Amino acid sequence: MPDPAIPQIPFIRRAGVCYARTARNLEIPVIDVSNPAFAVADDAQSVEALRQTSVGMMRRNARMPRFLLRMLIRAAAKRSFLARAMLRKADSTFLAGMDTYLIKLGADNLVPPFDTPSDRRFAAYPGIQGIRIRLQQTARLLAEALEPALSERPGAPLHLLNIGGGSAIDSLNALILLRRRTASLLQRPVVIQLLDPDTNGPLFASRALAALVARDAPLAGVDARLLHTSYNWDDPAPLQELVATLAADGALIAASSEGALFEYASDASVVANLEALYNAGKGASLVAGSVTRADELTRSGLQFTHFKLMPRGARVFADLIQGTGFRVERVYESLSSDQVLLLRETRA
């Protein structure tokens, strides 16, 4: 059941941007990383500049008395919805899907009631920019790896499995990038299989997809639909069954998990989910996702949140997944996460 509606004052919609409604009936932009309005510079030099800015902020915070720092954090949470979502929900061990989505919009794309000066300042922080880069890089990795796979199997149904993805915005953006590169590759049935215990994120995801496939929108003409299944990654049996069924039907299967499975799940759950995706070499051909970095900057930042992230970094993660049937093929670095592309191995 959607959450009760909350008031939203009229605002000017940006040309060339799609909009969809949340469970609370708020109209917000649909992120399209191919649109300059949402794109973030993610080259090595830009990421390093963000890192240095974050280091400077961390050092200033370290010199500040703890009671004063806590007071400033509480004050920020009172003035900014976005800050409140990240800093005050002490009963939650992860950032909810739609809260995460809102901070990915970027300061210039915020709409009422999330567009106060405090919200805009918060959305411009380096750590938030890093989360936007995380989305952009995950979508790019997925699209880049899918391009040759789709070329080899024209017309085969494409199923994008999104684990813990909330709004599935990484899957949607991978499709947008593919459409812009080679539109003919999406001349096939496309299904986003959204596996998430949440309901608000998937509801928005379905509405976002409807907006994207509308006339003159980025995915206009694409035969795409979204299916939501409530899923707990600590019990991968439903995933195993889904992958086996899709493989038997001859589908092309790819998976992603941006800001979810590889960042929050235990080692055992990460391994079990990858083994389910592998399906004895007949399942997903590739997986894209984000891994929390384990450097000093990331660990220092985590002390200001209540989220139970698992700082591993790409190297430790690569060791962890040995034997699952996947290997790390490519890594893109952001501020607090490494985005990884996993390719299926051929076992003897």
Regions found by a protein language model. Give the residues of each.
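Alpha-helical subdomain
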Residues: P2-Q8, I12-C18, T22, M58-L69, ...
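Rossmann-like AdoMet
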Residues: P2-R153
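Residue-identity detector for glutamine
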Residues: Q8, Q45, Q52, Q129, ...
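Short hydrophobic/aromatic-rich motifs at helix boundaries and adjacent loops
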Residues: R70-L72, L110-D115, T182, L246, ...
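Short glycine-enriched loops at secondary-structure junctions
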Residues: I103-N109, G164-I169, V291-R293
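Short acidic/His/Gly/Ser-rich catalytic and metal-binding motifs that mark active-site loops
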Residues: L110-D115, S171-L172, D295-S300
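Conserved adenosyl
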Residues: R120-D249
